[in-house]
A protein has these predicted regions:
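Conserved RNA-binding domains used in RNP assembly and mRNA/RNA metabolism
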Residues: 1-102
Length: 102
């Protein structure tokens, strides 16, 4: 399950918790990305950039000290889809709705 993490540094990370590397002191996160707010064009909504948390590592799981995690939340569907696109995962399509005409 993809989760959002806010760190004591103010960074927001998105990734998948990894139970195999999580300990009492460390939270393992698979493919963590830092969310970077980016100013769009004037009058347009702000955009979110996705950047690898530690771009120069070959490791797929990064361990973060639990003491440095302020909170953990569930991202909205748009954020999940954007993360899946950035990590090469299949994007979950929205649930189909049936429309009937009377």
């Amino acid at each position: 399950m993809i989760r959002l993490f806010r760190l004591t540094t103010g960074e927001d990370l998105i990734g998948t918790p990894d139970q195999d590397t999580t300990t009492d002191d460390f939270q393992g996160i698979k493919q963590p990305f830092v969310l970077i707010p980016m100013q769009g064009e004037p009058g347009k909504p702000m955009k979110i950039g996705f950047h690898p948390y530690i771009p120069y590592t070959q490791d797929k799981v990064i361990k973060i000290k639990k003491a440095n995690i302020i909170t953990e939340t569930t991202p909205d569907n748009n954020m999940i889809n954007a993360y899946q696109q950035n990590t090469g995962q299949l994007v979950t399509p929205p649930k189909a709705k049936i429309i009937t005409w009377l």
